[in-house]
Amino acid sequence: MKVLVYGASTNPSRYAYIATELLLQHGHEVSLVGIKKGEVLGLTIQQEQPFVKDIDTVTLYVGPANQEGLLDYLKALAPRRVIFNPGTENPELERALEKAGIQTEEACTLVLLHTGQF
């Protein structure tokens, strides 16, 4: 499955980094988007909002205050679902995505992976 981690970080103690590691361990193809340049486990963090083809799932690691302009980007990517990890919940964005036919889920990517529900 092709997954985009939005809010990627090079800091190994950040949940976005841990999620990237677990996604790779579970055999997923991972793309990273973040505000700072860098690499995570050999993957380059892309800046801005690059178009990435065939994304199944976007997992968010940015809070509502940093989600401005995200709706148009997510609609352009047209993923099957967007996971709102703890602290990223945004009912307005969730409703808009669902209206656009994109499934949303308030969940923890780490828990979903560890419990086989991803």
Stretches found by the model and what they are:
Residues 4-5:
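Conserved beta-strand elements of the Class I
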Residues 8-12:
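N-terminal beta1-alpha1 ligand-phosphate binding loop
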Residues 13, 20-41:
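NAD(P)-binding Rossmann-fold cofactor-contacting core
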Residues 24, 98-99:
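Anion (oxyanion) recognition and catalysis
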Residues 32, 84, 104-107:
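General beta-strand structural signal in soluble alpha/beta enzymes
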Residues 39-72:
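Glycine-rich, highly charged phosphate/nucleotide-binding loops
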Residues 75-97:
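ADP-ribose/adenylate-binding Rossmann-like module
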Residues 103-118:
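Active-site capping/gating segments
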